[in-house]
Amino acid sequence: MAVATSVATPVPTPAYSAGRAPAKEKKIYLPDTLAEWPWPRAINPHYAEAKEESQAWAASFNAFSPKAQHAFNRCDFNLLASLAYPLATKHGCRSGCDLMNLFFVIDEYSDIAPVEEVRQQKDIVMDALRNPHKPRPEGEWVGGEVARQFWALTITNASAQSQKHFIETFDEYLDSVVQQAEDRSESRIRDIQSYIDVRRNTIGAKPSFALLELDMDLPDEVLAHPTIQSLSLATIDMLCLGNDIVSYNLEQARGDASHNIITIVMNELNLDVNGAMRWVGDFHKQLEKQFFEAFNNLPKWGNAELDAQIAVYCDGLGNWVRANDQWSFESERYFGARGLEIMETKTLAMMPIQRTEALGPQLVDDSIL
């Protein structure tokens, strides 16, 4: 489900001019981005069963140390999938869980790997996805087998169109992961617009949206329609902003916040952390308007079945925004055991920098680096 880069999301005019704060800022105030978002929390009824299966499956690869695997499990990426695909079948829910686990295996390994190694990881994963029934070479990086098994199970009950869209967009996602590694190796901090252009792919939203259409047959021209494109792009950008807002504190503590909109805005507009948070909150409001302008004017194709599928698909995009936000606070990924409290107060303490080169998520101050 490729989203054309010709559909532009305007970057808002700077509204804040406060100078950069001292390096050790006491409190971070999160913007309440979804205060008026109409999609309520919904969860797939197969969550518990799919989580048990997918968590055991992910652990079976021994991709992380036991300590890191424990922290990984506390992130509960299966919850994210079950919130994101509340209407999916048991098979669809399991595929969603497996995909989220695959994403984070790729993320954790690529975050600490040199650029050339990340390129090799990309080639391994794409070869596995394109050849899901071909055994992986002995001694190969574990991500190849994780990807192969995920896709071999998923395609047993997936339409040809959804498979096509997934492969295309996962390739784009991995290209952006390589680009992120290049930026990191060069200590490059992008400007706002070029960062957004890259972040739209590193978030992994496009292949995630392909799982919304596993039981649909959406033609390419439907997904390429300007209104659907605008809707998809607004959704992706809201997911990017939402994720960067909640992950910033941990990323800056890890010394790896260069690929985060908060850092980008602070650097370009000379704002402190909370000035950047407010700026991003205002940007999010613009994206909400873009989303609803498209959502309330969906095209009709004169085919009742296709129109119904489009309606369900687009409703799924709106739900994805809520799902990502809920998971961010309900899991222990970003806020440890204090997620629900922080969801209410929107306030947290700035963590001190605690760099780690260890592979996999690490427990620090009851949160997960």
From Swiss-Prot:
A motif (NSE motif) lies at residues 243-251. It catalyses: (2E,6E)-farnesyl diphosphate = Delta(6)-protoilludene + diphosphate; (2E,6E)-farnesyl diphosphate = alpha-selinene + diphosphate. Mg(2+) 2 binds at residue 107. Ca(2+) switches the cyclization mechanism of delta(6)-protoilludene synthase from 1,11 to 1,10 cyclization which leads to the production of beta-elemene. Its cofactor is Mg(2+); Mn(2+); Ca(2+); Ni(2+). Mg(2+) 1 binds at residue 107. Changing residue 117 to A: Does not drastically affect cyclization in the presence of Mg(2+) or Co(2+), but severely affects the activity in the presence of Ca(2+) and Ni(2+). Changing residue 116 to A: Does not drastically affect cyclization in the presence of Mg(2+) or Co(2+), but severely affects the activity in the presence of Ca(2+) and Ni(2+). It is an enzyme of class 4 (lyase). GO terms for biological process: isoprenoid biosynthetic process. Mg(2+) and Mn(2+) are more tightly associated with the active site motifs (D(D/E)XX(D/E) and NSE) and thus lead to more efficient removal of PPi. In the presence of Co(2+) and Ni(2+) the activity is retained and delta(6)-protoilludene is the major volatile sesquiterpene produced. In the presence of Ca(2+), the major sesquiterpene produced switches to beta-elemene. A motif (D(D/E)XX(D/E) motif) lies at residues 107-111. The record marks 104 as: Plays a critical role in the stabilization of intermediate cation. Keywords: Calcium, Cobalt, Lyase, Magnesium, Manganese, Metal-binding, Nickel. The 2 conserved active-site motifs D(D/E)XX(D/E) and NSE are required for coordinating the divalent metal ions that stabilize the PPi moiety of the substrate. Terpene cyclase that catalyzes the cyclization of farnesyl diphosphate (FPP) to delta(6)-protoilludene. In presence of Ca(2+), a significant switch from 1,11 to a dual 1,11/1,10 cyclization occurs, producing beta-elemene as the major product, with lower levels of delta(6)-protoilludene and (E)-beta-caryophyllene, and traces of beta-selinene and alpha-selinene. Belongs to the terpene synthase family. This is Delta(6)-protoilludene synthase STEHIDRAFT_73029. It comes from Stereum hirsutum (strain FP-91666) (White-rot fungus).
